[in-house]
Structure formats: structure tokens, C-alpha cells
Amino acid sequence: VRLWSAYAAKHENLKLEIRTKCAGHAMWDLPCLSNVIYAFTLSPQKMIDAFEKETPSAFARIVCAAEGLKKGFPVRLCFDPMLYLPSWKTDYLQLLSQIDRIFGDRMLHDGWEKLVDVSVGTFRISQEYMKKLRR
């Protein structure tokens, strides 16, 4: 991240997205650049437990994103991939409520407005590729 940030600092016309599932706060010690967007991939905890083993919790990712927002960094929230599971609606509503609570706890009542944007995406692996993975 440090090297990408340094590169972006030298190329102001470049817009760089750093996509992450991290909860480490060291990146907030880097210079705050308007052309470097820190994009946090968020999933309901149930999905993290099932499909994203050994990655930080939803809570830890949201706390990290909130800290970046509070320090003025460009932050994007990515709900990608959204997976259709029987309880998807409840799971994602709980995740959105958790974001509201964490933003509120950190005095980021305007947190949603401070975000660069929010992206939503679906699972994009082709059926042919999935067949190969299952073999």
C-alpha cells in the first residue's frame, strides 16, 4: 500500500483504488491523497465465516473504514460479491445497521455522506469455471 500511495502521489491524474478486507490501521499513517481510494469489501459476518476464512470480521473492517473517514481519507464501501442465501435480506440489513452504529459510535453521523461511494456487485464466476472448481 505504501508503494502504491507513493506512486499515486507522483501521478495526480491517476485515480487508484486499493481494494481491501483489512482491519489494519497502519495505512492511515500514510499521506491522505484525494486520488487514492481505500475500498473496503464488506459482507455479513455469516458469509465471512463461511466463505472468507482467516479474514478480519465485518466489525473490524467497518471500524477501520470509519477511522479512515474520520481522518479525511477517501473511502468506498463495496458489497461485493452479494450472495443470495436464504437469509440474505436479514443479513444485509444487519450489516447496514452495524455500519450505522459504528459510524455513530465514532462521531461520524455524516459517515455515509463522507464516503466516496458505495459499490454493489454479484458473484461473477462463470458456471463453466465453477464446474472446474468443484472437480
Protein language model regions, located:
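Core AdoMet radical
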Residues: 1-64, 74-78, 115-122
